[in-house]
Design a protein with these regions (language model features):
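Adenosine-phosphate binding glycine-rich loop
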Residues: 3-4, 200-201, 305-415
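Glycine-rich, N-terminal phosphate-binding loop and its surrounding beta-alpha-beta segment
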Residues: 40-112
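Flexible, glycine/charged-enriched surface loops at secondary-structure junctions
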Residues: 24-30, 98, 135-144, 167-170, ...
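Short, Gly/Pro- and small/polar-rich lid/capping loops
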Residues: 2-41
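Rossmann-like adenosine-cofactor binding region
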Residues: 245-335
C-alpha cells in the first residue's frame, strides 16, 4: 500500500470526526479542502549574479473564525500537500484553544543552509512581494516555522510595511522584541504543554513534585520542558536525549547544566554523572511523564506496548502513529495530543498580535496567566469530549475543534 501523504492523512482524520459528529455532506465537503491557496514563482538574483527561481506556497484553509494564522517553512522537500495539511491542522489547533483565528501555512522549496544571508533576505522579501495581496493583519498572519527565524520575520514584516506605505507590525508574529515581539514566546510551547500535564496529573492523582520525567529531544522545546518541569513544578528529570543519544540519572539531571554542556560539546551525551541511554530505551522508561519533543513517528505499533509512562505529553508534532495511539489508549496511558500539547506557541503568537494592535506590551506574568487560562480550558474541553464520545484524547481534540468551526460556519450562514 502506498504511503499516505500528509494531506490525505488530515482528510482521513476529518472523515472520522465527521462521522462522530454526524456532519451533513455539504459541511463535510467544505472542510475537506482549503478555502484558498496561492502558488508563486520567486526569482532571486544569487550572489554569483545568476537568477534562480524558487517555488513558494501560501494556503489559507478556513477563516470562518477569523484571519488565518500559520508559519512559513523553508525546506528543500516542501510540498503543497504538506502545506495544505499543516494549514488544516492549524485551523483545528486555533479552534481548540479558542482563539479567533483560522488556519494557514506557507512554504518555499529551498535549502536555507545553502543560501547566504543576502540571498535569504532577498528570498524572504520577494516572497512577501508575491503574496502581499493575500496576507495582512486582518487577513492572514504568518509566523516562523521550519528553518525560518525572527530575523526572517523582521525582513518580511519590513517588506510588507514598505509596500503598504506604513508600519504593519501585526502582519507577522515571532518577531524580535525590539520591533513588536512578545515576552513569553520563547518557552511558550513547552510552558503550554506543562499546563496540560499539570491538569492531567490532577485528573490521575499524580503529584508533579518529585514526579519522574523523560524527555526525548533537547532543542528549544525539550530544553524548556526540562527547565520548567524542574524549576516550576519540582519534577525530577531523569533522562533527556538528542539526535546523538541520551543520558540517564535516576536522582535527576540539572536541566540548565545539561543545556550548557550541549552548547559546549554539541550534544547531551557524556554529561558528567549520567549514564548513557538510547533514544529507544528512553521512550520505554518507567516514568510518570514522557515528553516526546523531537521527531515524528517515534512511538509506533512496534514499541507502544512497551511504553510505561503514565502521561505522554506530545510537545513534538506527530510523535505517535495511529496504531500506537490505539495501543496506548487500550493500556490506559493518557496521551496529551500534539496539537493540544504544543498549542502554547500559536496562543502566544496570538497574544503578540493583540499587543501589536493595541500598541500595549503585556508583562511576562500577564502572558503566562493568559496562556495558562487558554491551555487549561482547552485541556478540559478535550477531556470532556473524550468521555462524552468515548474516544481517545487525540480524536476528542479534533472533534472539539471541528465542532467549534462548524458552529461558526452555521452561525455565519455558510452552511
Amino acid at each position: 500500500m502506498a504511503k499516505l501523504n500528509p494531506f490525505e492523512i488530515s482528510q482521513k482524520q476529518l472523515d472520522i470526526c465527521a462521522d462522530i459528529l454526524n456532519l451533513d455532506s455539504g459541511t463535510h465537503a467544505i472542510l475537506r479542502v482549503p478555502m484558498r491557496e496561492l502558488h508563486v514563482s520567486i526569482p532571486i538574483r544569487m550572489d554569483d549574479g545568476t537568477i534562480k527561481v524558487f517555488q513558494g506556497f501560501r494556503v489559507q484553509y478556513n477563516d470562518v473564525k477569523g484571519p488565518t494564522k500559520g508559519g512559513i517553512r523553508f525546506h528543500p522537500d516542501e510540498t503543497i500537500d504538506t502545506v495544505r495539511a499543516l494549514a488544516a491542522w492549524m485551523t483545528w489547533k486555533c479552534a481548540l484553544v479558542d482563539i479567533p483565528l483560522g488556519g494557514g501555512k506557507g512554504g518555499i522549496i529551498c535549502n536555507p543552509k545553502e543560501l547566504s544571508q543576502g540571498e535569504l533576505e532577498r528570498l524572504s522579501r520577494t516572497y512577501i512581494d508575491k503574496v502581499f495581496q493575500f496576507i495582512g493583519p486582518d487577513q492572514d498572519i504568518p509566523a516562523p516555522d521550519v528553518y525560518t527565524t525572527p530575523q526572517i520575520m523582521s525582513w518580511m514584516m519590513d517588506e510588507y510595511s514598505k509596500i503598504a506605505g506604513k508600519n504593519q507590525f501585526g502582519v507577522i508574529t515571532g518577531k524580535p522584541m525590539c520591533i513588536g515581539g512578545s515576552v513569553g514566546r520563547t518557552d511558550a510551547t513547552a510552558r503550554g504543554g506543562w499546563y496540560c500535564v499539570r491538569e492531567a496529573a490532577k485528573e490521575f492523582g499524580i503529584d508533579l513534585k518529585g514526579a519522574t520525567v523523560a524527555i526525548q529531544g533537547y532543542g528549544n522545546a525539550g530544553y524548556y520542558a526540562a527547565l520548567l518541569g524542574q524549576t516550576i513544578f519540582g519534577s525530577t528529570i531523569v533522562a533527556v536525549s538528542d539526535s546523538k543519544g541520551g543520558i540517564y540519572n535516576a536522582a535527576g539531571l540539572d536541566a540548565q547544566a545539561v543545556y550548557e554542556h550541549k552548547a559546549k560539546t554539541g550534544s547531551v551525551i557524556d554529561f558528567p554523572g549520567s549514564e548513557p541511554i538510547t533514544n529507544e530505551d528512553l521512550l520505554e522508561l518507567d516514568v510518570d511523564v514522557l515528553v516526546p519533543a523531537a521527531l515524528e513517528h517515534v512511538i509506533t505499533g512496534e514499541n507502544a506496548a512497551k511504553i510505561r509512562a503514565k502521561i505522554v505529553a506530545e510537545v513534538a508534532n506527530g510523535p505517535t502513529t495511529p496504531d500506537a495511539d490505539d495501543i496506548l489508549h487500550e493500556n490506559g496511558i493518557h496521551v496529551i495530543p500534539d496539537f493540544l500539547c504544543n498549542a502554547g506557541g500559536v496562543t502566544v503568537s496570538y497574544f503578540e498580535m493583540v499587543q501589536n494592535f493595541n500598541r500595549y506590551c503585556w508583562t511576562e506574568e500577564e502572558v503566562h496567566e493568559r496562556l495558562d487560562e487558554r491551555m487549561t480550558a482547552a485541556y478540559h474541553a478535550t477531556l470532556r469530549g473524550s468521555k462524552k464520545y468515548d474516544v481517545n484524547m487525540r480524536r476528542s481534540a479534533y472533534v472539539v475543534a471541528i465542532e467549534r468551526v462548524v458552529e461558526a460556519m452555521e452561525t455565519r450562514g455558510w452552511v
